[in-house]
A protein has these predicted regions:
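A generic structural signal for residues embedded in beta-strands
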Residues: 16, 55, 598, 627-630, ...
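Loop/turn positions that initiate beta-strands
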Residues: 50-52, 593, 622
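ASCE P-loop NTPase helicase motor core
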Residues: 234, 329-332, 338-511
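C-terminal accessory regions
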Residues: 502, 610, 621-739
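Conserved helicase motor core of P-loop NTPases
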Residues: 455-617, 628, 735
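Pre-Walker A segment
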Residues: 272-347, 353
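Accessory, non-ATPase domains that flank or precede helicase/AAA+ motor cores in DNA-metabolism machines
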Residues: 1-308, 739
C-alpha cells in the first residue's frame, strides 16, 4: 500500500501490553487527543508510558483481540513536561529507574530531566542515593535505548527486519546509524546477518546507482562471504562473476571489471590453482596457504628416534593389560618417527585405544602432550576417555576478540607458541581451515601433531574440507583403522553404522540390542512418540534419565525439526511453574531449568566455577548448559555450562537456543548415552548418508529411530557429498614434490 494512503493517529502511550525485545514488536494502548484509548501494534522499541507518537497505518481486525491499529511508520517524541517525564521514567523506560528514583530525579530537574540524563549524568549524583557510578550507568542506559530506538525506526521505515537494527547497535554502538547511512551494505556483513537483498533494497531506496562500483563490489564480497559459509575457501572467477551478476541484475562483464578492482586493492586474493581461477577472501587465502606450508614442512621432517618401538609397545601392552592390533602398532611407530600423523576410522575400530597408546608412549618418552578437540563436548569426552585434561582449540589457543571487536585473535600464535612436545587433536573432521591454520601456527617447530577423526563424518561447518584433503593428499602418514573391536562387534549401533557408511540397508525391523526403530508414518505421531520416550518410556523402562537423552534431527525446520521438537519437549520436560521464572524472547520462552546451547562463539563472556575457585572467559558454539535462574528485575539469566556459571543479559539471548533437540551437525563431536533420531521430510541436501551415519555414531548405549523406513533408505542411498572449492590437497602435493 502506498504510504500516502495510510491513516494517521497521534496520542500518548498509556500502557505497554506486550513487547518483544528481540525484534521491537510491541502492542500498546495509545490515548488520543480526545482521551480515548486505542490498541496499536507495530515496531516500537523501548516504548514506555508517557511518550507521544504519531503513527501511520490502517485499522485491522484481530481474531482474538478485535479491532486494532497496525502501524507501518511512526514518529516518536519523548515527553517534555515534568508530569509526563515522570510517567515515562516510572513506567520502566530506562533500566534501573523505577517510580521512587523517577520521582527523585524529576523533582530535582523537572522539564530538563531527560537532557540531564543524556548530557549531564554527573548532576544525577547530586541526588542522595545515586552514586556517580550509578548516575553514569543510568545515563548510559538512556543513551543506548535512545540510539537503538532511532536506529530501529530508521530500519523499520524501509520495511527491513527490526532484528538487524538490534544486531547493528550491539556491534557498532552509537555510530551504527551514521555508518548505515554511509554504507547500507554493512547490513549484509557476516556479523550483522542481513541478506544482500535487504541491504541492496535499502541502498537503492536511498538513491545508490544500480551500476555503481560500490554496489557491485559489495555484491561480490557478499557472494564470497556467503559461499565461505557454505564451506568454500574460494570461488572460481567465472562462477563468481556469473553469480554476482544474477544477484544484482547486471552483466557478468561489469562484475568482472570490479573483481579486478578488488584484486588490485587486496580485497580479493587471486591465484590459478587446481585448474581454477580461484578468488579468495584474503583471510581464507592466507589460512589455506600457510596451513599447507606448515603441514608440508612437518611431512618432510622425520625423527631418528633411538627408542626401540618394539620394546615400547611391549611395555605399554604389559602396563595397560592389552594387546594392540597390527594397525594400532603401526600408529605408534608412525607417531614415533614422524612429526605429523593421521589416524582415521569408524566407530568401534579402536581410535580411542590408539589415542591412549600414543599418549602413553609420549609420556614414556618424557614428552609433554596437549589434548584438544573442536568443541567443549568433544574435549570433555576426550578427557573422560584418556584421563588427561583436554581443552577446546579455542581455549587452548586463548582465543579472544580484538580491540575493535570485529574479529577473533589467538593469543597463542607464531610469536607466542604453545608449551608442548606434542598435540593430539580429536574430531579433526570438524576443524575448518581457519582453525587448523591457527593451531598449526601455534605449534612449536619440533612438536608432533596427531590428527584423529572419522573421515566419513560430516565435514566442518566452516570453510574447507581439511581432514579429507589432508588424507587425500597422500603425503601425510595415515592409518585407517578397519577392524571392529567395540563390544566384540556385538553392538548393532556399530554394525549398522558401518553398513550405512557402505551404502547398505540394515534390517530396521530387527528391534534388539542397542538399536531400535519405531515406525511412524505421520510427523505428529513421531513428535508424540519422541516426547513420550524422553519423559516416561526411557526413564521408567530403561532407567535412562532425560538428561542422558539427546534428540537429533537433520533439520531445524518442519514438524520434526529441532525448533518444533524443542517446543514440545520443553512443555513436557520443563513446564511452567510458580517457582520457575521465565522470559519471552521472540517466539521462544527461556525458563529456569531449560536445557540450552550456545550457538556462537563468545570469547568475552565471563564465567566462574560453581565453587568460585576459578574464573575465566569464553563460552563457545555448541556448549550445553542448564538455566539456573531468570532475573526479570535485573533483566538477565544465569546458565550452568557443566560447572561453569555464566550470566547473560536479555539482549544477549540471541546466543542461546533450546537443546533437548539439536541438529546432527551441532551434535558432531559428541557422544550421548541415548540418541533418538527423528526422521521426517527435509531438504535433500540434509537427508544424506553422511548425515545419517554421523547421527547413528553419536549414540553410545542406545539408538532409537523414529519415523519411516523409506526416509532412512533414501538417506542411505543419497550419497551426496557437497563439492567444496578448496586447494589444500593440491598445495600439499605441490609443496611435497608430488605434483
Amino acid at each position: 500500500m502506498d504510504e500516502n494512503e495510510l491513516l494517521e493517529l497521534s496520542g500518548t502511550v498509556d500502557s505497554v501490553i506486550y513487547k518483544n525485545e528481540e525484534n521491537g514488536y510491541t502492542v500498546l494502548r495509545l490515548r488520543d487527543e480526545n482521551g480515548e484509548g486505542v490498541t496499536v501494534v507495530g515496531c516500537f522499541p523501548y516504548a514506555a508510558p508517557g511518550e507521544s507518537m504519531i503513527v501511520s497505518g490502517n485499522w485491522v481486525s484481530h481474531s482474538v483481540h478485535g479491532r486494532q491499529f497496525k502501524a507501518e511508520f511512526s514518529q516518536r517524541m519523548l515527553p517534555s513536561t515534568a508530569p509526563a517525564i515522570y510517567e515515562y521514567l516510572a513506567g520502566g523506560a530506562v533500566r534501573g529507574i523505577g517510580p521512587a528514583t523517577a520521582a527523585l530525579i524529576v523533582n530535582k530537574f523537572g522539564d530538563k530531566t531527560l537532557d540531564v540524563l543524556e548530557n549531564a549524568p554527573q548532576k544525577l549524583a547530586e541526588i542522595k542515593g545515586i552514586s556517580a557510578a550509578k548516575a553514569e550507568q543510568l545515563s548510559k542506559s538512556f543513551r543506548q535505548q535512545a540510539g537503538i530506538r532511532r536506529l530501529m525506526e530508521f530500519v523499520c521505515s524501509f520495511g527491513l527486519r527490526p532484528i538487524l537494527a538490534m544486531r547493528m547497535y550491539k556491534y557498532y554502538g552509537a555510530e551504527a546509524l551514521e555508518l548505515l547511512r554511509d554504507n547500507p551494505y554493512i547490513l549484509a556483513s557476516v556479523h550483522i546477518g542481513g541478506s544482500f537483498a535487504e541491504a541492496d533494497r535499502l541502498a537503492l531506496e536511498m538513491g545508490i546507482d544500480g551500476y555503481s562500483a560500490n554496489r557491485i563490489c559489495a555484491a561480490i564480497i557478499f557472494e564470497l562471504q556467503h559461499n565461505s559459509g557454505n564451506g568454500h575457501c574460494f570461488i572460481p572467477r567465472e562462477q563468481l562473476a556469473a553469480a554476482t551478476a544474477k544477484l544484482i541484475g547486471v552483466e557478468p562483464e561489469d562484475v568482472d571489471e570490479n573483481i579486478e578492482t578488488l584484486i588490485s586493492g587486496g580485497q580479493i586474493r587471486y591465484e590459478f590453482i587446481a585448474g581454477r581461477n580461484a578468488c579468495y577472501l584474503p583471510e581464507l587465502y592466507e589460512a589455506e596457504t600457510n596451513a599447507a606450508e606448515i603441514l608440508a614442512r612437518m611431512c618432510r621432517r622425520s625423527f631418528g628416534d633411538k627408542a626401540d618401538i618394539n620394546k615400547i609397545i611391549a611395555k605399554l601392552e604389559k602396563s595397560q593389560h592389552i594387546s594392540y592390533a597390527p594397525l594400532q602398532k603401526q600408529v605408534l611407530e608412525l607417531a614415533l618417527k614422524n612429526q605429523v600423523v593421521v589416524l582415521t576410522g569408524g566407530p568401534g575400530t579402536g581410535k580411542t585405544t590408539s589415542i591412549r597408546a600414543v599418549l602413553a608412549m609420549f609420556d614414556e618418552l618424557g614428552m609433554k602432550t596437549l589434548l584438544t578437540a573442536p568443541t567443549g563436548r568433544a574435549a570433555k569426552r576426550m578427557t573422560e576417555l584418556t584421563g588427561q585434561d583436554a581443552s577446546t582449540i579455542h581455549r587452548l589457543l586463548e582465543a579472544k576478540f580484538d580491540d575493535t571487536g570485529d574479529s577473533v585473535v589467538f593469543t597463542k600464535c607464531e610469536s607466542d607458541r604453545l608449551d608442548c612436545d606434542a598435540v593430539i587433536l580429536d574430531e579433526c573432521s570438524m576443524v575448518d581451515i581457519i582453525l587448523m591454520n591457527a593451531l598449526l601456527s601455534a605449534l612449536p617447530p619440533d612438536a608432533r601433531l596427531i590428527l584423529v577423526g572419522d573421515a566419513d563424518q560430516l565435514p566442518s561447518v566452516g570453510p574447507g574440507n581439511v581432514f579429507s584433503a589432508i588424507i587425500r593428499s597422500g603425503v601425510v602418514p595415515t592409518v585407517r583403522l578397519t577392524e571392529i573391536f567395540r563390544q566384540n562387534g556385538g553392538s548393532r549401533i556399530v554394525r549398522n553404522a558401518h553398513m550405512i557408511n557402505r551404502g547398505e540397508h540394515p534390517d530396521f525391523a530387527e528391534n534388539a540390542g542397542d538399536f531400535f526403530r519405531l515406525r511412524r508414518l505421520q510427523a505428529a505421531s513421531s513428535v508424540e512418540t519422541i516426547t513420550e520416550l524422553c519423559t516416561t518410556r526411557l526413564p521408567n523402562k530403561m532407567h535412562i534419565p532425560p538428561e542422558d537423552i539427546q534428540v537429533l534431527s537433520p533439520t531445524r525446520k518442519g514438524e520434526l525439526g529441532t525448533v518444533n521438537l524443542n517446543r514440545h519437549l520443553q512443555a513436557a520436560l520443563n513446564p511452567p511453574a510458580k517457582d520457575k521464572p521465565e522470559k519471552a524472547f521472540g517466539d521462544v520462552i527461556f525458563r529456569k531449568g531449560d536445557r540450552v546451547m550456545q550457538i556462537k562463539n563468545n570469547y568475552d563472556i565471563m564465567w566462574r566455577t560453581e565453587d568460585n575457585r576459578s574464573a575465566g572467559t569464553g563460552i563457545f558454539n555448541g556448549d550445553i548448559g542448564v538455566i539456573t535462574s531468570v532475573d526479570l528485575e535485573n533483566e538477565g539469566i544465569v546458565v550452568n555450562f557443566d560447572g561453569r556459571i555464566a550470566g547473560y543479559g536479555f539482549d544477549s539471548l540471541l546466543e542461546l537456543e533450546h537443546a533437548w533437540a539439536m541438529t546432527v551437525h551441532k551434535a558432531q563431536g559428541s557422544e550421548y548415552r541415548a540418541v533418538i533420531l527423528a526422521l521426517g521430510q527435509a531438504s535433500q541436501m540434509l537427508m544424506t548418508r553422511d548425515v545419517f551415519y554421523t547421527a547413528v555414531t553419536r549414540a553410545r548405549e542406545l539408538l532409537i529411530l523414529v519415523g519411516d523406513d523409506q526416509t532412512a533408505h533414501q538417506m542411505i542411498d543419497n550419497y551426496r557429498q557437497s563439492k567444496r572449492y578448496t586447494a589444500l590437497r593440491v598445495r600439499l602435493r605441490k609443496l611435497c614434490g608430488v605434483e
